[in-house]
Amino acid sequence: MVYFKVILFLSLIFSHIQSYANETDSACLTLISNNQCLKALEVCRVDAEQGDPKAQTALGMLLSGITHGDFRKNYKQSFYWVKQAAEQGYSKAELAIAEMYMNGVVIPMNAKKAKVWYEKAAAQENLNGVNGLARQYRYGTGVRKDYEKAFQYYQQAALEGHTRSQVGLGLSYRDAKGVKKNMVKAYAWILIAAEKIDKQQLQAIEERYKDERENLDQTMPQCKHLSRLEQMSEIMTTGYAQRILLDLKQRMSIKQINKAKKLALEIKKERAFTRSVL
């Protein structure tokens, strides 16, 4: 459980790497995917020093995200390079800065500063930024607790297909946080998130990752995981949604569940939601 909590935190910070790798043949990102961590540091630094915000973000993530071997993390430099990218308006770096402030690992925790950077990312339609604001208002971290605002942010991102926000929206309906309690809508939104990966596929992926962790060569620097943290976050969120469904089934009638399933189908059709491609 602790491992997956760490991965969820890292995935929010490093989520740009996988999507960027899909957009470009950048040697920097290719080296990360191939686990050539020290070479990646060299190549990413060259591009970062030339002002490339994507390379700056990747370099910052490497400096705090490489594990094992004799590599020593450099949190100060990690924050420096990511902030360089964020100050250029690169939304994924803005999100990374927000998460750094929220989690207090790379830099001291400062939820109020995190909110500023979440807002910058959200203003550029970064759904993780929108979700970050939802979480702050839901739990009163750095802001006065406001369930209605949290609900609005969850709904905004959920309607665009953001899985964590779909779960957050469902829980808001379940717990009557910012909206009138509605178990049918709660089940529908949790179901939408839960069905993005089927149970057998989820189990197979989790087993594969478990085997990789158990057979990891800890004498060598490791960074390949940074290229797929977004995928791992999606897996964890989907698994969490599936567990919530089991609880909801114990609290709802067959009639309510069938109504919720119908609603979920209508929402998916209207919003053109699709299953995750892993």
Task: Briefly describe each language-model feature range.
Residues 27, 43, 58-67, 96-103, ...:
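Hydrophobic face of amphipathic alpha-helices that form TPR/SEL1-like repeat modules
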Residues 24, 36, 49-52, 66-69, ...:
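Short helix-capping/linker turns of helical repeat alpha-solenoids
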Residues 5-15:
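Bacterial N-terminal signal peptides
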Residues 207-208, 214-278:
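Terminal, low-structured helical/coil segments at or just beyond the last alpha-helical repeat
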